[in-house]
């Protein structure tokens, strides 16, 4: 899915750092970008599921040429499970409408989907990732 839709300049189909399928819950940082989906989450550090074996981003140009929307919170394995340049987990198009990511935020939008959820937030009905889907819905509704 994801691998077919991203420009070849950033994704090479390289195996993850471990050279095996990875399924884990890792932390990511949402960075400022043009991403419509992640706009209300900028500055947050959230847990998210990863599940891939070929998810390594390789970038031939300098970092400032890309709209990096999300990065793994750690540079090294296992915190950066695929070994992507600059620990990149997601990039977006210049207009922010297209978001290419390896983590599976759709698997972490409910608190019970998290292996650890903050003690002080036990009453949450949904996890913060739901905002990404709300942002996308609202953008579509307002830009028909």
List each model region and its residues.
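Amide-donor transfer/coupling interface in amidating biosynthetic enzymes
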Residues: 3-144
């Amino acid at each position: 899915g994801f691998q077919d839709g991203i420009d070849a300049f950033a994704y090479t189909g390289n195996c993850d750092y471990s050279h095996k399928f990875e399924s884990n819950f890792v932390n990511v940082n949402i960075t400022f970008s043009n991403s419509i989906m992640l706009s209300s989450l900028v500055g947050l550090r959230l847990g998210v599921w990863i599940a891939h074996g070929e998810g390594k981003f390789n970038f031939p140009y300098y970092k400032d040429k890309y709209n990096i929307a999300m990065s793994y919170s750690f540079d090294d394995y296992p915190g950066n499970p695929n070994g992507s340049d600059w620990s990149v987990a997601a990039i977006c198009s210049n207009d922010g409408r297209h978001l290419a990511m390896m983590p599976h935020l759709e698997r972490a939008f409910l608190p019970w989907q998290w292996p650890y959820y903050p003690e002080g937030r036990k009453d949450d009905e949904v996890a913060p990732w739901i905002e990404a889907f709300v942002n996308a819905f609202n953008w579509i509704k307002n830009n028909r």
